[in-house]
């Protein structure tokens, strides 16, 4: 089985800065693999271990994907190779535009039997790209996948959790016409941490750059990005023990009008 895993690189949200004007500061913020795509990479690795190959596919800017560090991070998590689409002219914040770029890149990547995605991305979490990729490729798409089990002869048992039940589907990856696009949830597995040997091997795996497919103009434009307005929180330290501290607290609350 030939597996393509789509993964997005996003700014590390733990190091974002909120500027005085409430805009988000991205200067110096490192890039990382989207948390939900780590689950997709882990699922791909587990399936490929049973017999098959795995290719990672990522689309984004040169700033996000151009460093060898982030490329090695992706490759250390199981893929045999990495295909990149670098385009600094598009922010890829429109889910349909992103899906068109991914679908074109998947077709350019060659033969495949299964396409895996995360349910959403850590930064935008639209939860739309996977099903849109399936529609553009003319393939069945299943989202919120919580389990994938090989059933022999290229067939996969796919589970997804609905509100009151678990739905079980069969996906046949024997021929390209029966390929599928699966968007996995974070519940499907716990992503493993790459061992040192995996990191060392990652530097020797092939990285190929693909031309950006024609994905049209975005239907969404970002006008501004603002953090929630911060409210000043007042603090009062009440010292003392027992009744003395209680009396001081009551006096403070009365003074503040509570």
Regions found by a protein language model. Name each.
Residues 1-258:
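N-terminal glycine-rich FAD/FM-binding segment characteristic of electron-transfer flavoproteins
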């Amino acid at each position: 089985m030939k597996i393509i895993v789509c993964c997005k690189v996003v700014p590390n949200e733990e190091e974002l800065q909120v500027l005085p004007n409430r805009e988000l500061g991205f200067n110096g913020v490192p890039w990382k693999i989207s948390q939900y795509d780590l689950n997709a990479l882990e699922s791909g690795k587990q399936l490929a271990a049973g017999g098959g190959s795995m290719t990672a596919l990522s689309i984004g800017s040169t700033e996000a994907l151009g460093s060898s560090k982030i490329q090695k991070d992706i490759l250390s998590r199981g893929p045999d190779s990495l295909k990149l689409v670098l385009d600094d002219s598009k922010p890829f914040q429109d889910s349909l535009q992103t899906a068109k770029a991914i679908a074109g890149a998947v077709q350019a990547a060659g033969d495949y039997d299964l396409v895996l995605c995360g349910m959403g991305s850590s930064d935008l979490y639209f939860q739309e790209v996977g099903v849109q990729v399936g529609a553009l490729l003319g393939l069945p798409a299943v989202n919120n996948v919580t389990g994938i089990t090989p059933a022999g002869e290229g067939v996969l048992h796919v589970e997804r959790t609905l509100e009151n039940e678990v739905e079980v589907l069969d996906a046949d990856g024997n021929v390209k016409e029966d390929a599928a696009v699966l968007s996995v949830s974070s519940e499907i597995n716990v992503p493993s941490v790459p061992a040192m040997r995996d990191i060392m091997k990652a530097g020797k795996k092939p990285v190929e750059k693909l031309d950006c497919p024609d994905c049209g103009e975005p239907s969404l434009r970002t006008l501004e990005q603002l953090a929630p307005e911060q409210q000043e929180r007042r603090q009062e330290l009440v010292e003392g023990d027992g009744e003395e501290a209680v009396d001081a607290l009551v006096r403070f609350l009365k003074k503040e009008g509570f």
